[in-house]
């Protein structure tokens, strides 16, 4: 049995916060933000919109595209560092709202690599024959844990949700290989402080990310028995264009074969990979049979990557 | 010295897209070679790979010119 992605969906808040808006909030400039991060604007969820609301919206789109009924879900995994509250989990909240009565539900905490952890976890249950349909959601309301007076981090983050239904696919499609990893010794470089603000040592995280993203991409390609030339499309975690470019260079891919949504949405942590996946599919950039590599990294430190042959 | 400078120069030319002639020992990465802070981090990473060494954050912050980089590498070897 092979596991693959049956359908995807996303939710993006309406409110746009541009670099020019940020210039009025902290000492920064549009030019500085663009050249250092590639970000031009990001979306911010309304005060009364929480992760569960965004997750449900994205999940409904994914279920519709997958043509899977909520009642047929066996498992719901929500990757988030910004749950509505510690418990009940976002996964339980959306289980109720979707009416997915049969599904077990748990949140996954692996920061920006959370969606990769979720997809790989779902894959295990599908390929063991235990479950048929696993809903994996990456959702974040990072605006709620951002220090809006810290110019180093306030410019980076955004809110949003992306979802995928993982299920059985034909033998010549689906997830070909994966890699998950963690390095707790780097935890000090990216964390939530006692004021619930995200703290980041930009230089250390940058170095880690550049090396790890490239490494993980190469590893999943090798594990899949493929070579760099076989990769049709790369979806890196949308943290910073400079980090993404480093991963792309490592794979020797042309610019048009890498997903870029960071300019519109900023870093949406666990949501960034599924949001990008939805947009690239809509733009017709990913076709049936294409080899797609997805790779994420985040606080923990954590990382995860998959190589997938797209299609059912 | 010549060998180290040559290898450092090649990395700088590749990474920053500058003319080899502009990569002088006294040239500052940020002021003369148009590098921003992330370019310098990337340069340091490439030097680490090229010369098989680890350059701590503290040391990296002191590397401002081409000469600083060359001296640092030679002192470590």
Swiss-Prot record, chain A:
Gene3D superfamilies: 3.40.47.10. Keywords: Acyltransferase, Cytoplasm, Fatty acid biosynthesis, Fatty acid metabolism, Lipid biosynthesis, Lipid metabolism, Multifunctional enzyme, Transferase. InterPro entries: ACP_syn_III_C (IPR013747), ACP_syn_III_N (IPR013751), FabH (IPR004655), Thiolase-like (IPR016039). The active site is at 112, 237, 267. Pfam families: ACP_syn_III, ACP_syn_III_C. SUPFAM superfamilies: Thiolase-like. Induction: Down-regulated by FapR. It catalyses: (2S)-2-methylbutanoyl-CoA + malonyl-[ACP] + H(+) = (4S)-4-methyl-3-oxohexanoyl-[ACP] + CO2 + CoA; 2-methylpropanoyl-CoA + malonyl-[ACP] + H(+) = 4-methyl-3-oxopentanoyl-[ACP] + CO2 + CoA; 3-methylbutanoyl-CoA + malonyl-[ACP] + H(+) = 5-methyl-3-oxohexanoyl-[ACP] + CO2 + CoA; malonyl-[ACP] + acetyl-CoA + H(+) = 3-oxobutanoyl-[ACP] + CO2 + CoA. It is found in: Cytoplasm. Its EC number is 2.3.1.180, 2.3.1.300. GO terms for cellular component: cytoplasm. CDD domains: KAS_III. Residues 238-242 are annotated as: ACP-binding. One of its GO terms (molecular function) is beta-ketoacyl-acyl-carrier-protein synthase III activity. GO terms for biological process: fatty acid biosynthetic process. Homodimer. Catalyzes the condensation reaction of fatty acid synthesis by the addition to an acyl acceptor of two carbons from malonyl-ACP. Catalyzes the first condensation reaction which initiates fatty acid synthesis and may therefore play a role in governing the total rate of fatty acid production. Possesses both acetoacetyl-ACP synthase and acetyl transacylase activities. Has some substrate specificity for branched chain acyl-CoA, determining the biosynthesis of branched-chain of fatty acids instead of straight-chain. Belongs to the thiolase-like superfamily. FabH family. The last Arg residue of the ACP-binding site is essential for the weak association between ACP/AcpP and FabH. This is Beta-ketoacyl-[acyl-carrier-protein] synthase III 1. It comes from Bacillus subtilis (strain 168). The lineage of its organism: Bacteria, Bacillati, Bacillota, Bacilli, Bacillales. The gene is fabHA.
UniProtKB/Swiss-Prot annotation, chain B:
It is found in: Cytoplasm. One of its GO terms (biological process) is lipid A biosynthetic process. 4'-phosphopantetheine is transferred from CoA to a specific serine of apo-ACP by AcpS. This modification is essential for activity because fatty acids are bound in thioester linkage to the sulfhydryl of the prosthetic group. One of its GO terms (cellular component) is cytosol. GO terms for molecular function: acyl binding; acyl carrier activity. Residues 2-77 form the Carrier domain. Carrier of the growing fatty acid chain in fatty acid biosynthesis. Belongs to the acyl carrier protein (ACP) family. This is Acyl carrier protein. The lineage of its organism: Bacteria, Bacillati, Bacillota, Bacilli, Bacillales.
